[in-house]
């Protein structure tokens, strides 16, 4: 016996939004009915005309465990994911210790099985301790369950080291995922090297420090035959480099964050460290280029770069506070309200950028509503308006620049493998 989600709205295979009933059985989608009456003896959940989408996928989150449990844990971070409609997240390796050896990856996998509320794909580090000095054992880490390889949080500074990493990853049919930043060009900055930095007398991070790493890496990826993925792209120059690389047939993909689509450095209200992230909020021209790049396919999908910190850390001020903001619980409402409701994106585009597009880029089975697919599903209320309130977050991190923003498009139910893991209003 299964359970039916009744009276929802979802996209069919032709991209048409239709009245939908979905049957969940044994952890998978057993049946889908479009524009038909439902006659069922099984249990029924009436979703009242709300949107039904594949569980959202976020391939860039920081769960902080081990070593950063004051900021977040696998349990709290994945509960935040479920609350945001995400059923699959990929956990970055800048933890203490990093998953840079087989034993640490095995420990992490066990911890995920014990405490995670949603599917977690663990990244492994490219270099030991993410120090950029010695490559990890890629084959052993893949065997232990690594999803892909990244030193996210820092850029791999040596071209030779990155090239060798790409060759090893290619031999294992694994991806290299890169935080792109040339340390010799960052200027010790806390914000973008633009008008905001000049106004407040702050050291700025120039755009070129990102683009130059991407330009280097796409050529290395071409030579190595490696799938190369660019994290949190933020500048118009970076978009241009990725666009040119794709035209040249290089296997490169890229993601963009909600905050880089929504904000630029002009929007920072004084020295508020909740607007400090890396890469920083760039210029209005950069933001416009990111939107254009997403629409024309240069940028493949959206990822949050969920980066929780404690209130005490963020209270240190914009120069001393750590980089990063949270994003799992607010991504869909923000993007729906400010891009779909305003006609910049279609609803289908937004859903695809948060589901099937990341799945296709990394060969995941998730990200689609189809018979036989995993029953990873989110139900979203497109009508109710609510203000973002960090005090209600499931995440330990409350560090968001979007407090008080009124949004529609709030998830109300999240299913992972057919199990209801979060429902609005239920403890």
Swiss-Prot record:
Protein residues bound to substrate = 62-64, 94, 278, 309, 323-324
Question: What is catalysed by this protein?
Answer: (S)-dihydroorotate + H2O = N-carbamoyl-L-aspartate + H(+)
What cofactors does the UniProt entry give for this protein? Zn(2+)
- Gene Ontology terms for molecular function: allantoinase activity; dihydroorotase activity; zinc ion binding
Q: Active site: which residues?
A: 305
Looking up HAMAP family in the UniProt record yields: PyrC_classI_B
Q: What does this protein do?
A: Catalyzes the reversible cyclization of carbamoyl aspartate to dihydroorotate.
Protein name (database record): Dihydroorotase
């Amino acid at each position: 016996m299964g359970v039916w989600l009744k009276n929802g709205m979802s996209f069919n295979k032709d991209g048409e939004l239709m009245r939908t009933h979905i049957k969940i059985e044994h952890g998978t989608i057993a049946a889908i009915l479009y524009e038909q009456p439902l006659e069922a003896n099984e249990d029924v959940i009436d979703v009242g005309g709300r949107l039904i989408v594949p569980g959202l996928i976020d391939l860039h989150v920081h769960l902080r465990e081990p070593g950063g449990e004051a900021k977040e844990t696998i349990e709290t971070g994945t509960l935040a994911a479920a609350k945001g409609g995400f059923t699959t997240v990929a956990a970055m390796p800048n933890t203490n210790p990093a998953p840079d050896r087989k034993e640490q990856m095995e420990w992490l996998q066990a911890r995920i099985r014990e405490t995670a509320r949603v599917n977690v794909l663990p990244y492994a580090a490219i270099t030991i301790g993410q120090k950029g000095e010695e490559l990890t054992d890629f084959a052993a880490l893949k065997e232990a369950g690594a999803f892909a390889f990244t030193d996210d949080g820092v850029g791999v500074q040596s071209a030779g080291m990155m090239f060798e990493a790409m060759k090893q990853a290619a031999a294992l049919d694994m991806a290299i995922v890169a935080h792109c930043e040339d340390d010799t060009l960052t200027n010790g900055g806390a914000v973008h090297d633009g008008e905001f930095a000049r106004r407040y007398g702050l050291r700025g991070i120039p755009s070129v420090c990102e683009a130059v790493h991407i330009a280097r890496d796409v050529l290395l990826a071409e030579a190595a035959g490696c799938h190369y993925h660019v994290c949190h792209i933020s500048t118009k120059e970076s978009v241009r480099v990725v666009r040119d690389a794709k035209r040249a047939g290089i296997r490169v993909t890229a993601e963009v964050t909600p905050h880089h689509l929504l904000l630029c450095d002009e929007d920072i209200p004084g020295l508020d460290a909740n607007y400090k992230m890396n890469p920083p909020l760039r210029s209005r021209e950069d933001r416009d280029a990111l939107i254009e790049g997403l629409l024309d396919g240069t940028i493949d999908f959206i990822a949050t770069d969920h980066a929780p910190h404690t209130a005490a850390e963020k209270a240190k001020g914009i120069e001393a506070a750590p980089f990063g903001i949270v994003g799992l619980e607010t991504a869909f409402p923000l993007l729906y309200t400010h891009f779909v409701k305003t006609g910049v994106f279609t609803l289908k585009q937004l859903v695809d950028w948060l589901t099937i597009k990341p799945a296709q880029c990394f060969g995941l089975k998730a990200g689609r509503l189809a018979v036989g697919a995993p029953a990873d599903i989110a139900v979203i209320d497109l009508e109710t308006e609510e203000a973002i309130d960090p005090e209600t977050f499931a995440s330990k991190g409350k560090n968001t620049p979007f407090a008080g923003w009124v949004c529609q498009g709030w998830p109300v139910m999240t299913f992972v493998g057919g199990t209801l893991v979060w429902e609005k209003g239920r403890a």
